[in-house]
Amino acid sequence: MRCAPTAGAALMLCAATAGLLSAQGRPEPPETPRFASWDEVNVLAHGLLQLGHGLREHVERTRGQLGELERRLGACGAACKDPEGSAAPPRAQANLVNPGGGDASPETLRSLKTQLEAQNSRIQQLFQKVAQQQRHLEKQQLRIQNLQSQMDHLAPRHLGHEMAKPARRKRLPKMAQLAGPAHNISRLHRLPRDCQELFEEGERESGLFQIQPQGSPPFLVNCKMTSDGGWTVIQRRQDGSVDFNQPWEAYKDGFGDPQGEFWLGLEKVHHILGDRGSRLAVQLQDWEGNAESLQFPIHLGGEDTAYSLQLTPPVASKLGATTFSPSGLSLPFSTWDQDHDLRGDKNCARSLSGGWWFGTCSHSNLNGQYFHSIPRQRQQRKKGIFWKTWRGRYYPLQATTILVQPTAAS
């Protein structure tokens, strides 16, 4: 009987499967910021399926060979144990398990039986490993189906009614929806870097969009489309639903509801503007229904400069640039826990409220405390939302909006 080749094949199969499972068992490396393409996912899935089918076919062939050996050994054992003496002659018995001729001694039979048991054990192990591999393939298939479902969900369309927009203009209703599909779409389509780029691509409807400035992960912004381009809304005050007396980290990362009151975040604004020429627009509203708008050419520094804001005289307003500070002066951002204002004797953010480019505390503060009516006491009013050169230092405004727009390529 020729068991050695079969045993060798089984051992080789076992080693190959063990190697495969060893590679599979390694911890997955940290997720990188790039997703594999759909073609690469298909190639990987096809390769895994082919490998699983090959393993199964090899095991089935080996099992069939071992089954034949077991049948012959069983027949030989039955003939040797026949009490009536009707067993075949010793040579015929040996030929049952050794068709090539030669004597099969009891030691040979015991050796064959030991080999058969060992190979049966290995076969069982192989079947367990193949079953494990099959489960892994099924999980991979589920992941592929999930990816396909997400791709279908992110087809080029608007949320409600517009079906002909490019996929990278995908709109989402809530900031929380950035997790999951929002990151996937950035791997499938290049997202716009700001609202102005959306405008240049033909978008004319204001609303919530995903953008991805250079060097930044994707995030949700509120875009306002006007006749002179797309503006990114970075702040809105309207009803006092959000507390703006926040620490430095909150002003850095952003807070609030992008469909209501919110602060986008200094780091996000810095990524949007980058080193490009930019302008900042401020929209103000008082309690009598009057409104005013201003625009400033600006440059916003990074965190190493405390997000310093440098501005020059306004380009579209009857109000003076002294609302912020003397023209050309660079003002760092301040909060109650990080004081960067120009006053050496006090912390403007603690004395007033909220975080802002305070300067000397007296020019403006659009992140101050929100009042639903004008307080009678002056000490209270100074903590409110104010713009000194419009409605005065002690008039708390009803609503404000701050927007930014790049004016030149980087």
Curated annotation (Swiss-Prot):
GO MF entries: enzyme inhibitor activity; identical protein binding; lipase binding; lipase inhibitor activity
Which SUPFAM superfamilies does this chain map to?
A: Fibrinogen C-terminal domain-like (SSF56496)
Mostly located where?
secreted
Q: Where is the signal peptide?
A: 1-23
Entries under Pfam families matching the protein: Fibrinogen_C
Q: Which InterPro entries match?
A: FIB_ANG-like, Fibrinogen-like_C, Fibrinogen_a/b/g_C_1, Fibrinogen_a/b/g_C_dom, Fibrinogen_CS
Localization in the cell = Secreted; Secreted, Extracellular space, Extracellular matrix
Which positions does the site annotation Cleavage cover? R171, L172
Kindly list the cysteine pairs connected by disulfide bridges.
C195-C223, C348-C361
Which superkingdom is the protein from? Eukaryota
Which keywords accompany this UniProt record?
Answer: Angiogenesis, Coiled coil, Disulfide bond, Extracellular matrix, Glycoprotein, Lipid metabolism, Secreted, Signal
Every copy of the Fibrinogen C-terminal domain together lies at 186-408
Stretch list, region Disordered = 81-106
Cellular component terms, GO, for this chain's entry? collagen-containing extracellular matrix; extracellular space
GO BP: any one term = negative regulation of very-low-density lipoprotein particle remodeling
Job of this protein = Mediates inactivation of the lipoprotein lipase LPL, and thereby plays a role in the regulation of triglyceride clearance from the blood serum and in lipid metabolism. May also play a role in regulating glucose homeostasis and insulin sensitivity. Inhibits proliferation, migration, and tubule formation of endothelial cells and reduces vascular leakage.
- How is this protein organized at the quaternary level? Homooligomer; disulfide-linked via Cys residues in the N-terminal part of the protein. The homooligomer undergoes proteolytic processing to release the ANGPTL4 C-terminal chain, which circulates as a monomer. The homooligomer unprocessed form is able to interact with the extracellular matrix.
Q: What is this protein called?
A: Angiopoietin-related protein 4
Provide the gene name from the record: ANGPTL4
